[in-house]
Regions:
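Mixed-charge (Asp/Glu-Lys/Arg
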Residues: 1-33, 38-139
């Protein structure tokens, strides 16, 4: 599977999960450098989401985990890491991301990022930290 297909699968899984949770979701019609989706609970205010997808965990020093590297772009409000084999999501504020991370896929790992396992709630309005600027309708 090529990286474009893998990335598209991750984006669609995140989009479906957000819709199930009641979020408004918008997808840019062209590739935007810095984010893949816009999502929010109000149709007029969105978070910019960068989606990163890993297909299977890899072994490193006797343990297995999903490895994400070369994380350079910081134009989004949140990164969502998709662990395909575990069907798991980590919703992480961009300012909490290092250049590379390892995730267990089930929230049990040692990384500080593990606390963001399944943390969809941080995208809701009660979580005012990391809120993006308002995106207004074109009407």
């Amino acid at each position: 599977m090529n990286t474009t297909t893998l990335g598209t699968i991750g984006e669609r899984l995140v989009e479906a999960e957000l819709l199930k949770l009641g979020f408004c979701v918008a997808r840019p019609s062209v590739d935007i450098d810095g984010y893949d989706l816009l999502a929010g609970t109000d149709a007029r205010e969105y978070h910019r989401l960068q989606i990163k997808t890993c297909r299977i965990p890899v072994e490193h020093k006797g343990s297995y985990g999903y490895r994400y590297t070369a994380i350079k772009n910081r134009k989004s409000d949140f990164f969502i890491f998709v662990c395909l084999m575990h069907n798991a999501f980590y919703i992480v504020p961009t300012d909490q991301i290092a250049a590379s991370i390892r995730l267990s896929g089930d929230g049990s790992g040692q990384s500080e990022i593990e606390k963001f396992f399944g943390a969809w709630h941080i995208l809701k309005p009660t979580s005012t930290d990391h809120a993006s600027a308002q995106v207004l309708d074109a009407q």
